[in-house]
């Protein structure tokens, strides 16, 4: 980690993880609790409209930065990097992420206070943001829910992502893996 950052730069260091996920109108079945004698009735729809949430999390503090985009590409990733850079302008940031094409392209403009560090290939279990997506889908009214429009998906996603800002302790418990103590 020390080799990644400029030793002359005296700004404090923050480690973030980044990931993106799709949220849309297509629905699937998920387990749920119902009384023993009853059967769950869940509607289903096959409308393939999606939005993409890009999120960074600092597992040590539970701080997040998120954007919602209609596309998942280099431009959207650039917007997230710019927003994160502005929010933490007085910090050096090491952002750990997967090797998606929009993370590794030369067209991605990386702010001066951010250094990107790729995770090993095929290792989503190392990225704590994956737990955030599971939490949002399970606890923030995406499971077994049908949306009438993409605007309704966006409104629910905005609410869920804004709620995360008030749940830093929960985020720390979900995202601060024991091995992370060694990388700060």
Model-based region annotation:
Residues 1-184:
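Short functional hotspots at interaction and active-site rims
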């Amino acid at each position: 980690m020390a080799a990644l950052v400029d030793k002359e730069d005296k700004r404090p260091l923050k480690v973030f993880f980044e990931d993106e996920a799709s949220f849309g109108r297509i629905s699937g079945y998920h387990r749920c609790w119902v009384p023993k004698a009853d059967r769950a009735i869940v509607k289903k729809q096959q409308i393939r409209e999606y939005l993409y949430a890009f999120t960074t999390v600092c597992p040590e503090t539970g701080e997040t930065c998120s954007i919602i985009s209609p596309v998942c590409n280099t431009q959207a990733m650039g917007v997230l990097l710019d927003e994160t850079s502005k929010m933490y302008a007085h910090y050096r940031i090491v952002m750990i992420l997967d090797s998606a094409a929009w993370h590794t392209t030369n067209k991605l403009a990386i702010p001066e206070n951010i250094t990107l560090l790729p995770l090993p290939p095929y290792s989503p279990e190392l990225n704590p943001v994956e737990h955030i997506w599971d939490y949002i889908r399970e606890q923030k009214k995406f499971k077994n829910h049908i949306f009438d429009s993409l605007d309704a998906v966006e409104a629910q996603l905005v609410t869920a992502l804004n709620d995360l800002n008030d749940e830093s302790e929960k985020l720390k418990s979900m995202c601060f893996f024991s091995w992370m103590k060694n990388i700060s």
